A protein has these predicted regions:
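Extracellular loop-to-transmembrane helix junctions
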Residues: 10, 40-66, 153-154
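Inter-helical loop and helix-membrane interface segments of multi-pass membrane transporters/permeases
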Residues: 6-10, 38-42, 72-101, 114-174, ...
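Transmembrane alpha-helical segments of multi-pass membrane transport proteins and ion-pumping complexes
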Residues: 29, 59-63, 71, 107-118, ...
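Alpha-helical transmembrane segments and their helix-start/interface "positive-inside/aromatic belt" motifs
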Residues: 11, 17, 44-52, 93-112, ...
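Membrane-embedded translocation segments of transport machinery
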Residues: 2-12, 16, 178, 182-250
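Transmembrane helix-boundary motif of multi-pass solute transporters/channels
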Residues: 14-54, 242-245
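Hydrophobic alpha-helical transmembrane segments of multi-pass membrane proteins
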Residues: 20-26, 52-57, 101-112, 160-167, ...
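Hydrophobic alpha-helical membrane-insertion segments
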Residues: 54-63, 101-124, 187-197
Length: 250
């Protein structure tokens, strides 16, 4: 890559903004939806023990490695893998072909997430207007969600989500992603802090906490506990995709 192509490249303006953006990249639907389900299914603390073990191991190796890879090449996955292969005296197109794999994977995730973001925006607006709670029973809520989740059932809010995302991306790293994360991530933290306080005073909370921190040796002998803990660690650290490598390149 030429010197001129890196001189005018956007970059992070603060360490704080970079850290918040990395957290925002990692803490996604895989943690908010899937993590509680797996903790409940695989024994609470029995699942958390291998999970935190994998987070430490992968964090000290994979995440740092991906970030260093992006920082060294100053490029996304296609260019980064192309440079890596070229440095070994081989055809860079081989590396570029490898780099397309995480790009295609991220595109598939983005398509699915755009639908979910549309749901979130619709429910957020409905919580302000009161329409979310307008249904009389569980069946009513189910029918309302089914209509929204049907093909073309939520086009407006899905389009709004895509437009907002596009505007943030057009504003660049420092003017878009970094700025929005400095606002959204603290709000996200206080939202979940308030939720944690609320749940602590609900009936049965003590039993739930005991379950979360209890470790059952027989559960640790189940290989699926370790398999899903490893998979969850990858989700939590946003590894093997584009995010960490691309953020490191800036």
């Amino acid at each position: 890559m030429s010197h001129s192509s890196t001189t005018h490249r956007d970059s992070w303006k603060s360490n704080w903004g970079f850290v918040l953006a990395c957290i925002g990249s990692a803490v996604g639907m895989g943690n908010i939806w899937m993590f509680p389900t797996r903790v409940s299914k695989y024994g609470g603390g029995t699942f958390l023990l291998p999970y935190f073990l994998f987070v430490i191991i992968i964090g000290l190796s994979g995440v740092i490695g991906e970030m260093a890879f992006g920082r060294a090449t100053r490029s996304g996955p296609i260019g980064a893998f192309g440079q890596a292969i070229a440095s070994r005296g081989k055809n860079p197109k081989i590396g570029q072909a490898i780099g397309y794999l995480p790009v295609i994977g991220s595109l598939a995730l983005a398509i699915g997430y755009s639908v979910i973001v549309g749901w979130i925006l619709k429910y957020a607006a409905g919580s302000l207007t009161g329409s979310v709670l307008a249904q009389a029973d569980i069946e009513g809520f189910g029918q309302a969600f089914g209509q929204m989740a049907a093909p073309f059932g939520n086009n407006f809010w899905q389009t709004v989500g895509i437009v907002i995302t596009f505007i943030i991306m057009v504003c660049g790293i420092s003017g878009g992603i970094e700025k929005i994360n400095k606002i959204i991530m603290p709000l996200f933290f206080f939202l979940f802090l308030g939720l944690a306080v609320y749940m602590a005073f609900q009936p049965g909370a003590a039993e739930g906490y005991r379950y979360i921190f209890r470790i059952e040796p027989e559960g640790l002998a189940d290989p699926m506990t370790w398999v899903f803990a490893l998979g969850q660690a990858f989700f939590s650290l946003s590894l093997a995709g584009n995010g960490t490598l691309i953020y490191g390149s800036y």
